[in-house]
Amino acid sequence: MSQPIKLLVGLANPGPEYAKTRHNAGAWVVEELARIHNVTLKNEPKFFGLTGRLLINSQELRVLIPTTFMNLSGKAIAALANFYQIKPEEIMVAHDELDLPPGVAKFKQGGGHGGHNGLKDTISKLGNNKEFYRLRLGIGHPGHKDKVAGYVLGKAPAKEQECLDAAVDESVRCLEILMKDGLTKAQNRLHTFKAE
């Protein structure tokens, strides 16, 4: 990984009614990282989201939770990235991932959107650049594509939520490893983790 990550984004829908839904898993990572570093996220209207700044291994990391709806996330990401001159390949987007089970998380660079509206808008607003990193947080799949919308906007049962929370905690630890020691070390640790 030649470039350090300069912006971590947690995809989410705004408002208390969505806070604990599976679709907001990406935001949980940003919230947990901010909590550990005692950073209060502030509402920044010009960036259409909640933002903060923290130092990991003396590297500056900006964090963002868009307060647009999910399908407009790219507007917030592009606004902040353009303002601070952050390149797509210096951005990590944390998002819920249907193709991984709850309790599993993976890092990835580049690729498509896999039907995820937040990723779709991010790619579009970054000028069709797909080279940003992703932190894919497994939420499992409801089994049929017609059930996906209700599933991602639903809340996980308690046991499943425990797995999601454990994966968020491990992801935060691995993000710090990534900032200090690079992607390979962080991947090696995160990709062997599975909360039961």
UniProtKB/Swiss-Prot annotation:
Superkingdom as given in the UniProt entry: Bacteria
Gene Ontology cellular-component annotations: cytoplasm
Which Enzyme Commission number(s) are listed? 3.1.1.29
Q: Where in the cell is it found?
A: Cytoplasm
**Site feature (Stabilizes the basic form of H active site to accept a proton) residues:** D96
Entries under InterPro entries matching the protein: Pept_tRNA_hydro, Pept_tRNA_hydro_CS, Pept_tRNA_hydro_sf
Q: Name one GO molecular function term.
A: peptidyl-tRNA hydrolase activity
Active-site residue numbers:
H23
What's in the keyword line of the UniProt record? Cytoplasm, Hydrolase, RNA-binding, tRNA-binding
Pfam families in the cross-refs: Pept_tRNA_hydro
Coiled-coil portions: none
Biological process terms from the Gene Ontology for this record are: protein quality control for misfolded or incompletely synthesized proteins; rescue of stalled ribosome
Could you confirm whether the keyword RNA-binding appears in this record? yes
Top EC class of this enzyme: hydrolase
Q: Where does tRNA bind?
A: Y18, F69, N71, N117
Task: Note the site residues: Discriminates between blocked and unblocked aminoacyl-tRNA.
Answer: N13
Assembly state and interactors? Answer: Monomer.
The function of this protein is: Hydrolyzes ribosome-free peptidyl-tRNAs (with 1 or more amino acids incorporated), which drop off the ribosome during protein synthesis, or as a result of ribosome stalling. Catalyzes the release of premature peptidyl moieties from peptidyl-tRNA molecules trapped in stalled 50S ribosomal subunits, and thus maintains levels of free tRNAs and 50S ribosomes.
Q: Which PANTHER family match?
A: PEPTIDYL-TRNA HYDROLASE (PTHR17224:SF1)
What NCBIfam families does this protein map onto?
pth
So what family is this one in? Belongs to the PTH family.
Question: What's the name of the protein?
Answer: Peptidyl-tRNA hydrolase
- Organism field: Vibrio cholerae serotype O1 (strain ATCC 39315 / El Tor Inaba N16961)
- Tell me the gene name: pth
